[in-house]
From Swiss-Prot:
GO molecular function: acetylcholine receptor inhibitor activity; ion channel regulator activity; toxin activity
Chain positions covered by the region annotation Loop I: 24-38
Annotated segments matching region Stretch between loop I and loop II: 39-44
Disulfide linkage: C24-C45, C38-C62, C64-C75, C76-C81
Signal peptide bounds: 1-21
Region (Loop II): 45-62
Family stated for the protein in its record: Belongs to the three-finger toxin family. Short-chain subfamily. Type I alpha-neurotoxin sub-subfamily.
GO CC field: extracellular region
Lineage, broadest ranks: Eukaryota, Metazoa, Chordata, Craniata, Vertebrata
Protein name, per record: Erabutoxin b
Length: 83
């Protein structure tokens, strides 16, 4: 009985995949495509876009930040969804 219970606990932990982390793109507008493994607890990715004297700037990363007016923000919750 103890063996069955222990086996059930191990299977549950493996199936739940405790400690799962999100992977997001984190490159800037003109940079080569790169990804980042997000910190535990960060379950979303963001794509932030604005314009200034340099032209259109795009920033990507983990989380879903608060932005100022005039900045376009898209947040998503799947792997590398912020391209």
């Amino acid at each position: 009985m103890k063996t069955l219970l222990l086996t059930l606990v191990v299977v549950t932990i493996v199936c739940l995949d405790l400690g799962y982390t999100r992977i997001c793109f984190n490159h800037q507008s003109s940079q080569p495509q790169t990804t980042k493994t997000c910190s535990p607890g960060e379950s979303s990715c963001y794509h932030k876009q604005w314009s200034d004297f340099r032209g259109t700037i795009i920033e990507r990363g983990c989380g879903c930040p608060t932005v100022k007016p005039g900045i376009k923000l898209s947040c998503c919750e799947s792997e590398v969804c912020n391209n």
